[in-house]
Amino acid sequence: DRITQGAYTDYDKLLKIYEYTAKNFYYDSVAFSTHSYQYADPYDNIYNYENGLSSANSVSGRVHTTCQGFSAIYLALARAQGIPTRFVYGHRLAVPSNDWLTEDNIDVRDHWWAESYVNGKWIFVDPTVGTTNKYNKSTGAWTYTGLTNYTYFDASDEQVATSHVYMNI
């Protein structure tokens, strides 16, 4: 409830959860490129962050994870508020590098995001791209930028179609 404090509607609660996730966690591109997706346990990630603990994927409370972990954290917090939320996976276009004509891996399942049911419909939420916080496992460098955008919080169907391919809900 602390994370969603001041939010009165489910939609506002989801927005606060999105902001919390984007502000407080770091994307681990090395884990992604080496397919080390073991950092997805949302309960450990949240607990370690809130208590400043170190673990396999956290140092002094700074937690690094991949898209699967970002989405799992968002999903766990949304469900804790009683808001139906589900995992979705598929492929996210490597923008701005590629477009659908130049993308090599369209059929590769390599990205996770979420959908939450609010106001009578499922909304698209990709908490990974709400931040550019980065962790470089090779160098140990942490780059903090905080929340950088709301582009993929309740994104329109048209917007999603330009960047994501659904492979499973």
Question: Across the structure, where does each feature detected by a protein language model lie?
Answer:
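Hydrophobic/aromatic-rich core segments of domains that either
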Residues: 69-160, 164-167
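Active-site nucleophilic cysteine motif
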Residues: 10-17, 21, 63-81
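Secondary-structure boundary elements
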Residues: 1-61, 159-167
